[in-house]
Amino acid sequence: MAKSRLFCLLVALGSVFMILFIIVYWDNVGTANLNLHTSFSKSLPFQSSEELSTAVTATRNRFVSDVDVFLNSFLNLSTRRSELQSTKAEKMPLRGSSSLEENARGYDWSTKEKLEDAILDQEMIQQERKLNLLQFCGNSSFGFPTKERSFDDIPNRELDHLIVDDRHGIIYCYVPKVACTNWKRVMIVLSESLLDKKGVPYQDPLLIPREDVHNTSSHLTFNKFWRRYGKFSRHMMKIKLKKYTKFLFVRDPFVRLISAFRSKFELENEDFYRSFAVPILTRFSNTTRVPDTVGEAFSSGTMPSFSQFIQYLLDPQTEEQKPFNEHWRQVYRLCHPCQIEYDFIGKLETLGEDTALLLRQLNLDTLFQFPPSYRNRTASSWEEDWYSKLPIAWRKKLYKLFEADFVLFGYPKPDDLLSV
């Protein structure tokens, strides 16, 4: 009888212990899942800054996160770097016979430390880029067209550069002349939006034909949401903007203009010739007869010059007729960075490092290789060669036209080009 009671007591105690264990376990798991549910841009706690909080208030609460998040993220990254450096001595093997043995076994401690340092550096650069963007979007003394409007004020037709991948929770705003062809290829593979000749989704970005990459039917973009969701389209956009990881890649604005001119006016392109070269030649050249075809124009050497192209951009009549083409339209008009809080800002100047970091943060770095691209054939060092031939007044007007892109994305003002 005593043994029976003892057995029952042990069973009861064991049951209580298991219940407590399950409660504690699921409480921890639930908390972890809750913390991991948000995008990586909101994963770190922050301290506030009075000056930046005032700036954020001026943005009329456009962003989901506030400056506190950015500041403390920046501080936490600095702290992580200090902690990493303080523990290096513990990680490094002692020199002597033991280090010889470990070298023989293939250990490379310095490589690991360099990788950790590089990742921290890249993360800090990201925080700096996002903080710079947030500061100027909230700076009431810095203005540019469309800055003060809300996301709801953006016309549907201007949301056509925001590509959505629902399978992985990603939104990419593509900017022409900034590696967008390869990023579009990646988005097609991730979203499985295009089938190959065998009827299966493409798995290798490089196998996707170029004409399909730029076909609008290959991508789900925000401007198509009204077809799916009708009157709920804006609500669905806001949900995805809040929950998905949003990124874009940018480039020095003046270098981007050179690249656009070279690809659209120094190569034979019949569509661009009729849509843009003919109007430019008609308005800004002394040509008595504009060639009918691009082939005839190249043969006779009557294609627009870079100077005439800049005149076309500066002429108010140009946008009175229709908006800038996407290849030279300002990034703030394509991607609306003061209305959309981007989680990642990449730059063409650091494309390799930024792409590697982004794919790693998205947990996509093991799925595929980012397509290799031609070495940046339009170099930043070309700026002076191309722009110094323009009148100083034109250069100043052009900078004013693209000033928002320079400032928002942290590109230095080209003072050498803007001084007499």
From Swiss-Prot:
Single GO molecular function: chondroitin 4-sulfotransferase activity
Listed GO biological process terms: carbohydrate biosynthetic process; proteoglycan biosynthetic process
Enzyme Commission number: 2.8.2.5
Key word Transmembrane helix present: yes
Pfam families the UniProt entry points to: Sulfotransfer_2
Lumenal compartment segments: 27-420
Family recorded in the similarity comment: Belongs to the sulfotransferase 2 family.
Glycoprotein in keyword set: yes
A cellular component annotation (GO) from this entry: Golgi membrane
Subcellular location, principal: Golgi
Catalytic reaction annotation: chondroitin beta-D-glucuronate + n 3'-phosphoadenylyl sulfate = chondroitin 4'-sulfate + n adenosine 3',5'-bisphosphate + n H(+)
Organism of derivation: Xenopus laevis (African clawed frog)
Bilayer topology term: Single-pass type II membrane protein
Signal peptide annotation: none
Entry keyword set: Carbohydrate metabolism, Glycoprotein, Golgi apparatus, Membrane, Signal-anchor, Transferase, Transmembrane, Transmembrane helix
General function of this protein: Catalyzes the transfer of sulfate to position 4 of the N-acetylgalactosamine (GalNAc) residue of chondroitin and desulfated dermatan sulfate. Chondroitin sulfate constitutes the predominant proteoglycan present in cartilage and is distributed on the surfaces of many cells and extracellular matrices.
Gene: chst12
Transmembrane segments: 6-26
Protein name as it appears in the record: Carbohydrate sulfotransferase 12
